Amino acid sequence: MIDFLGDWKRTHYCGTLTADDTGKEVVLMGWAHRRRDHGGLIFVDLRDREGLAQIVFDPDNSAEAHHKAEAIRNEYVVAVKGKVIPRPQGTVNTNLRTGAVEILVSACKILSRSKALPFTLDDYVDVAENLRLKHRYLDLRRPVLQDNLILRSKVAQVTRQYLTGNGFLELETPFLTKSTPEGARDFLVPSRINRGEFYALPQSPQLFKQILMISGFDRYFQIVRCFRDEDLRADRQPEFTQIDCEMSFIDREDIITVMEGLIARIFADVKDMSVSLPIKRMTYAESINRFGVDNPDLRFGLELVELSDIVKGSGFKVFADVVAGGGIVKGLNAKGCGGMSRKEIDDLTEFVKIYGAKGLAYVKVTEDGWQSPITKFFTGEEISAMTKTFAAEQGDLLLFVADKPKVVNDSLGKLRNQLAKILGLLDKNTFNFVWITDFPLLEWDEEEKRWAAVHHPFTAPMDEDLEYVENDPGRCRAKAYDLVLNGNEIGGGSIRIHQEKVQSLMFKMLGLSEEDAKAKFGFLLDALEYGTPPHGGIAFGLDRLIMLLTGSDSIRDVIAFPKTQKGACLMSEAPSPVDLKQLRELGLKTTGK
């Protein structure tokens, strides 16, 4: 029989009771996490979002409550009245906040029963993710996931407090908007009233927040959901959340200063950690040169070194021919890895091939010098020069890639990260920030044979590079900046184009005709002609930031109801077929799978 709550009122959360509460009469409510019958006394760990409390049913104290406790099973919802008492000597649990006390129960109500669980809710038990996602309402009871989402809520609160305190207004932008497919595919929403026409769910509030600046709101922010219909990876979701900000009458330094303050406040209030300000900066060119990527993880070394000048005249034809053909030769020193087996090196070779490299040359530095199939092709002077460039010592493993610059940097940059995983160099409790600046404005898309925006089409070129936009696009740098944390881009922003002529030129360089630009972005181009302040902003990926703050391995562990890598919600079974009547109302019909 199920009891009614009646006039009982909870007095405390389970996980908040300490020795200071000894002697208090309390009312607790929660889930029976674990029940233990000691042949007289019955112990139940009662759980809520704040933690566990041990409750004790003693027949000498309340025979009725003890009888009711005999029916309690895991995940029953229970309410108890009782007195906080010290635990007996030798039974204190120092791992729990409540570990010094227990509650001697005088009355008990069973408010709801539970079926047998499909999996246990202990954090340390490994459960298939699909099973967890199918029963997400149970999965979310696990303390580790509850802690993740509670921390997420705290980050949102701190963000709102900080930004409103710095003059930002929290303003909302539309979810039903115009499709402007530049990059990822849009999620489309058919209009019933305007048959044959569609809304799109926003990939970001970019255009609307710029228009808010044109409208004179000066400082805007929003913790906003965004949508992209793209192939998913471990750190991607079709719907994700951004901390979105925009400011008027500012330059890059103003934005960076304010946003560094936000990051420092979040880490101070949520992690009790100090972020050293100002955050280190690095240009895009330096980042690519030293680390092969534009989102370097600075928790470890393994920097890339340039060897082209040393090997261009060498007897090793593979290297010499690459340099003669306009390519480069770079490498990295895997310190102390000279003992790697041939199979392990072959695995690394297969890894770099994923990123376009044709192979991976290697050298083991031994007591007798270089040990490698390629050693014989180099002079003693060349070996000495490379040894110095690598800062190589006995026991090191030197790894080389020769190819086009992009292939070399991509493959070695990814190899650097892979080696860090293999060597255990990734400390989740270390947080290393860096701003990457001075990105290229445009890059050549070899497949589509046109220029593409490195960030997005609304990013302003450097003032001194404006003349290159049309005449030498590859030389033009952008007023763009990314904030990188432990190899993850957690924020990206730029100063925006605030002149209609420059924006129209940018669209032209991206291959949009004047008619296409007007059709897709006419409302922005029109707005730019009515007095637009210099403005810029940034968007932080909230999901990814929380993933790093909590040390989670997957972004799905910091989102309450995430999708799978196939974009499905296993709990609600979305997406799903819809009624034919609904499709007819929209003027649609499906063509099958």
From Swiss-Prot:
Site (Important for tRNA non-discrimination): 38, 90
Binding site for L-aspartate: 182, 228, 455, 496
InterPro entries with a match to the protein in the record: Aa-tRNA-synt_II (IPR004364), aa-tRNA-synth_II (IPR006195), aa-tRNA-synth_II/BPL/LPL (IPR045864), Asp-tRNA-ligase_1 (IPR004524), Asp-tRNA-ligase_1_N (IPR047089), Asp/Asn-tRNA-synth_IIb (IPR002312), AspRS_core (IPR047090), GAD-like_sf (IPR004115)
GO CC terms of this entry: cytoplasm
Single GO term (MF): aspartate-tRNA(Asn) ligase activity
Pfam families the UniProt entry points to: GAD (PF02938), tRNA-synt_2 (PF00152), tRNA_anti-codon (PF01336)
Naturally occurring in which organism (per UniProt): Geotalea daltonii (strain DSM 22248 / JCM 15807 / FRC-32) (Geobacter daltonii)
Main location: cytoplasm
Name of the featured protein: Aspartate--tRNA(Asp/Asn) ligase
Family to which this protein belongs: Belongs to the class-II aminoacyl-tRNA synthetase family. Type 1 subfamily.
Keywords: Aminoacyl-tRNA synthetase, ATP-binding, Cytoplasm, Ligase, Nucleotide-binding, Protein biosynthesis
UniProt: ATP binding residues: 228-230, 237, 489, 541-544
Catalytic activity: tRNA(Asx) + L-aspartate + ATP = L-aspartyl-tRNA(Asx) + AMP + diphosphate
Subcellular location: Cytoplasm
Record region (Aspartate): 206-209
Matching PANTHER family: ASPARTATE--TRNA LIGASE, MITOCHONDRIAL, ASPARTYL/LYSYL-TRNA SYNTHETASE
